[in-house]
Amino acid sequence: MATERNRRRKGSYPQLPPAPDDYPTFPDKSTWPVVFPEIPAGTNGRFARPPQHTSKEAAPQIPADQVPQHVAVVMDGNGRWATQRGLGRTEGHKMGEAVLIDITCGAIEIGIKHLTVYAFSTENWKRSTEEVRFLMGFNREVVRRRRENLNDMGVRMRWVGSRPRMWSSVIKEFDIAEQMTVDNDVITINYCVNYGGRTEIVEAARELAQEAVDGKIKPNRISEAQFAKHLHRSDIPDVDLFIRTSGEQRASNFLLWQAAYAEYVFQDKLWPDYDRRDLWAACEEYVQRNRRFGRA
């Protein structure tokens, strides 16, 4: 905990310095799946530095106390991206994989500690059987394919969502990834698959109601803090910065409890066209906001 306090001390800058010019870059989208480059192993107990962006741009300098600690992202626009190019919708999802890994690298470079991404909502079951089957299998394969790369960079991986209807094979891959990365502390990434904000709140309410019926808790003593303990992951901090791509401007049932006081940044790029520089731009816009939390 002391390390985290020092990292975010006022006046300090948590950004990684510019990478050497010959340091590996990512992503090269000429092939799919996009190949993750071989990066030098970390030294002195440290994790490996992420590959730099292909542009070789470095993260902007933002004081530690102004960097959003928790960033949530609605990765929107995959289907439209594919349709605009005369491709099937699944091709857009495929291209989005590299973007997810790229913004993870960018989040590490700028000093973000928690990243939560919306990969499959409880409403997505309404899509065609073909697309749902693809998305479930795709999430499973992405976790299996990328967990070693993310582990090398000190990423802690976790699944957030509801178990009903969730494919057991997807849960299995997330369980393996979570066990592999449980001690990593560079950044925590929460992958929301079969997630819905209202469902999360209802499930928490059911648990509390049952505790009240069992006499374990008095209804009139239930607090926000007690309620939060029954969310899918009670240790997820409140969202500081909420990003949605593709130009749409709505929350779409994502992190309704955790994002109560988040700053929203809506960006026009479709998700497959997005990269870490867009994430950094959103962080710079966040710095300009005046967060009052109900105060005058």
Curated annotation (Swiss-Prot):
Free-text cofactor note: Binds 2 magnesium ions per subunit.
Cited InterPro entries: UPP_synth-like (IPR001441), UPP_synth-like_CS (IPR018520), UPP_synth-like_sf (IPR036424)
Catalytic machinery residues: D76, N124
Cofactor(s) this protein requires: Mg(2+)
GO biological process annotation, one example: polyprenol biosynthetic process
Residues in coiled coil: none
Keyword Transferase belongs to the record: yes
UniProt-listed Enzyme Commission number(s): 2.5.1.-
Keywords for this protein: Magnesium, Metal-binding, Transferase
A Gene Ontology cellular-component term: plasma membrane
Keyword Membrane: no
A GO molecular function held by the record: magnesium ion binding
Organism superkingdom: Bacteria
Basic residues composition-biased segments: 1-11
Region (Disordered): 1-29
Sequence positions that bind Mg(2+): D76, E263
Binding residues annotated for substrate, in chain numbering: 77-81, 89, 93, 121-123, 125, 127, 244, 250-252
Family, similarity comment: Belongs to the UPP synthase family.
Function: Catalyzes the condensation of isopentenyl diphosphate (IPP) with allylic pyrophosphates generating different type of terpenoids.
Subunit composition and interactions: Homodimer.
Protein name (record): Isoprenyl transferase
Name of the gene this protein is made from: uppS
